[in-house]
Amino acid sequence: MACLLRSFQRISAGVFFLALWGMVVGDKLLVVPQDGSHWLSMKDIVEVLSDRGHEIVVVVPEVNLLLKESKYYTRKIYPVPYDQEELKNRYQSFGNNHFAERSFLTAPQTEYRNNMIVIGLYFINCQSLLQDRDTLNFFKESKFDALFTDPALPCGVILAEYLGLPSVYLFRGFPCSLEHTFSRSPDPVSYIPRCYTKFSDHMTFSQRVANFLVNLLEPYLFYCLFSKYEELASAVLKRDVDIITLYQKVSVWLLRYDFVLEYPRPVMPNMVFIGGINCKKRKDLSQEFEAYINASGEHGIVVFSLGSMVSEIPEKKAMAIADALGKIPQTVLWRYTGTRPSNLANNTILVKWLPQNDLLGHPMTRAFITHAGSHGVYESICNGVPMVMMPLFGDQMDNAKRMETKGAGVTLNVLEMTSEDLENALKAVINDKSYKENIMRLSSLHKDRPVEPLDLAVFWVEFVMRHKGAPHLRPAAHDLTWYQYHSLDVIGFLLAVVLTVAFITFKCCAYGYRKCLGKKGRVKKAHKSKTH
């Protein structure tokens, strides 16, 4: 017995030291994030990887929004030619411009210019990073095992190529929905709606025509947004570079998708779905928020937030919203830092910040007023809370359309809606049981999975670090030209064969026909000469 006990102790100690050794010799990961809400899900993955013993270095511009110090990673800071005030002003302009009136004809141009306010800033960051020789030398000397990035803008993609590192993308979507084109996934326009169209996967003929035309315009939009990055990449890599080719070198795509929100579509084997990764177990609320909920009585609360980029609204619109909120019996917790509307009702409480997921997970929450950003939509799905959606930009319009199609919420045009529209929408999602039933059904489907999204994401990042990439998952479609991919050369060859055979057959028939006619003609002539 004592011998068995000693053996067990030795085995236990061995397992402990092996685990400890695995933690000590963890891999090195270089993280190139995108500031703002995109960082939130990436941060969760980074923290778990750090807890598992990996050494994490996060590349951070010295002026930023959310990329703060942490015990989980080391920040590598690089200088940028602007200050915190300019950063704040750009984001404020970006948010406020979405409430400006615009005509149908000028809307695309206005949206493009507004997006460039922020995208231009990210390009300055990328330029500053890739031209900082000291920082690049540090990366080379550090000998990282992989690079983890958000590829919505391609700075991390270029850096991975420069350092020769396998890469993992954490991704929601490009501004022009070309991620499936880059991954070579089948992407038929007949049933897969393009970004910003607000179409479902069951399109009318006219919608399919529009979808087809948008598909033709997407490469041009990509060129407009990314041509500067292509020039920058060529200068850094000292060769002519095609950005699309760089994107195609990714090892694994971690896509913040789930088919409870997305329309079904084919994907490639190196594309992993981790939609809902931001959903966490509800934590206890602070005394302040618990008091608000307790005071709401049987009617419960409504949570109202338009995301991290928008916390102020033009006065006239804010007053219209406040008027609608005052006409429902629920207590409304509104994340808002602008001027307090003069008509704000007693049931509406303004807060500078709110624990969104924890509030949505509370059983007294009746509805969620949201801009339909992917984080908020997934938190609403996870917690089973119906939505009133006021999309502002990016993928929010499409997210809202998807949830409305599934009967989980009501969509309003924030520029055109009236106080009465918002009031009616709130009363509908709160009082009509079908909205609650539909969102609970989606919640049940979403949470019925073998592996949690966060665990899945961590596994694949570690997989790429362990194996120095995932070439076995890379489809051969990347090695084909566009005409080979669509089998145009094969079609052309077979068409040429058919035409050649048809031509030869025609010539043979024509020759035979002429021969036969010629023979008959000679026979007739001979017959006539004999009769004479």
Curated annotation (Swiss-Prot):
One family name in Pfam for this protein: UDPGT
Single Gene Ontology MF annotation: enzyme binding
Signal peptide coordinates: 1-26
Record: glycosylation sites: 294, 346
Outcome when changing residue 184 to S: In allele UGT1A6*2 and allele UGT1A6*4
Main location: other
Glycoprotein as UniProt keyword: yes
Annotated tissue distribution: Expressed in skin. Isoforms 1 and 3 are expressed in kidney and liver. Isoform 1 but not isoform 2 is expressed in colon, esophagus and small intestine.
Subunit structure: Isoform 1 interacts with isoform 3/i2 suggesting that oligomerization is involved in negative regulation of transferase activity by isoform 3. Isoform 1 also interacts with respective i2 isoforms of UGT1A1, UGT1A3, UGT1A4, UGT1A7, UGT1A8, UGT1A9 and UGT1A10.
UniProt name for this protein: UDP-glucuronosyltransferase 1A6
Organism: Homo sapiens (Human)
Gene: UGT1A6
